């Protein structure tokens, strides 16, 4: 028997299937190939992913990084045994942060930890990651799948990612030019996205609630579980199109902490985003969460995106143009507020 096979057999006895790892890599290669762009310099399988930086048109290129995971939304994917969209969420959580600086995402890396490497499941997860990369213009240049027998149940897995983007230093969006009278525009979300799922799981008792899988008239015939698993919206291409023609002064990715935690991150001291609560197009899933869990409205806005996945601040004189551009990109975009002087960085009225 060859030495390598002996090692593999010993490792398999400890719970790590090297052969399954090889199989998973082969299955995911076709998905990774979809993400290749002009910056890719090598194929998957090396010790490091190489990427050529597009700096010719920039005076002072700056790299912008972001890393995130999907959190306990993974549990919904596991309950539905549907794993081909959760990777979109992982990419979205990272690239939507990177674009808030005005940076164009370049490449992405993923990390999967699992109790047991089931090649077909791993390939489904990576297929979702690849789709997110395609949507954001990112190349998937590397990743890691780690099998953790004895630490995780066989069906369990966790997913995280890392995005790197680039922007010319003079074009970094840093809120320094924001002024009273500027307009706050909302970009609609596709649903809960990837935050607040610990509360969602408690409200709906997801481990013991068969009604989650049944069609729900309030949700347009979709089940609660299906609605919850809807992938996080990726706003990269829409924001890049907006940046080409409009003076964008601030961008907020509405994630964990909702409006109260995320909008202030793009507002400078002395200014306040005054949001018209009645203008927000709250999605039915949030109404259902609030009613089922008897959750106060402020808590909802302090936890969830409530139907607004991203907000941008633009001059009032360019608001109409911004809406036209975003609509042309397929976004449901609308005005939800204005910038005023104030000590509180966000007020919902």
Identify the function of each model-found stretch:
Residues 2-13, 121-136, 152-159, 210-211, ...:
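Glycine-/charge-enriched secondary-structure boundary and capping motifs
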Residues 2-39:
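N-terminal amphipathic/basic leader segments beginning at the initiator methionine
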Residues 17, 68, 181, 253, ...:
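Residue-level signature of catalytic and energy-coupling elements of molecular machines
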Residues 27-190:
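Glycine-rich phosphate/pyrophosphate-binding loop regions near the starts of catalytic domains
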Residues 61-64, 69-71, 174, 213, ...:
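Acidic-glycine-rich active-site phosphate/pyrophosphate-binding loop
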Residues 178-222, 226:
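Acidic, glycine-rich loop-and-beta core segments that form the ion-binding/anion-interacting portion
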């Amino acid at each position: 028997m060859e030495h390598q096979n002996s090692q593999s057999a010993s490792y398999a006895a400890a719970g790590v299937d090297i052969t399954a790892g090889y199989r998973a890599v082969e299955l995911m290669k076709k998905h990774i190939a979809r993400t290749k762009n002009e910056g890719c310099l090598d194929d998957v399988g090396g010790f490091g992913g190489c990427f050529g930086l597009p700096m010719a048109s920039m005076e002072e290129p700056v790299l912008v990084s972001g890393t995130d995971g999907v959190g306990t939304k993974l549990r919904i994917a596991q309950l539905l045994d549907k794993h081909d969209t959760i990777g979109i969420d992982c990419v979205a959580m990272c690239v939507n942060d990177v674009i808030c600086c005005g940076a164009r995402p370049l490449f992405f890396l993923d990390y999967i930890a699992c109790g047991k490497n089931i090649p077909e499941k791993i390939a489904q997860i990576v297929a979702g990651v690849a789709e997110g990369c395609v949507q954001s213009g990112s190349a998937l240049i590397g990743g890691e799948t780690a099998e953790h027998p004895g630490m995780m149940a066989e069906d369990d897995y966790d997913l995280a990612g890392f995005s790197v983007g680039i922007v010319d230093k003079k074009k970094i969006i840093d809120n320094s030019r924001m002024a009273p009278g500027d307009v706050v525009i909302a970009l609609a979300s596709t649903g809960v996205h990837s935050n607040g799922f610990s509360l969602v799981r408690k409200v709906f008792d997801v481990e013991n609630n068969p009604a989650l899988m049944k069609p729900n008239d309030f949700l347009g015939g979709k089940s609660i579980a299906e609605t919850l698993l809807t992938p996080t919206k990726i706003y990269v291409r829409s924001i890049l199109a907006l940046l080409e023609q409009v003076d964008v002064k601030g961008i907020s990715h509405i994630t964990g902490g909702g409006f109260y935690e995320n909008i202030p991150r793009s507002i400078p001291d002395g200014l306040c985003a005054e949001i018209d609560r009645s203008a927000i197009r709250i999605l039915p899933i949030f109404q259902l969460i609030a009613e089922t869990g008897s959750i106060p409205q402020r808590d909802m806005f302090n936890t969830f995106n409530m139907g607004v996945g991203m907000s941008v601040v633009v001059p009032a004189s360019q608001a109409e143009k911004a809406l036209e551009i975003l609509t042309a990109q397929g976004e449901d975009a609308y005005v939800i507020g204005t910038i005023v002087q104030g000590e509180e960085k966000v007020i919902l009225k």
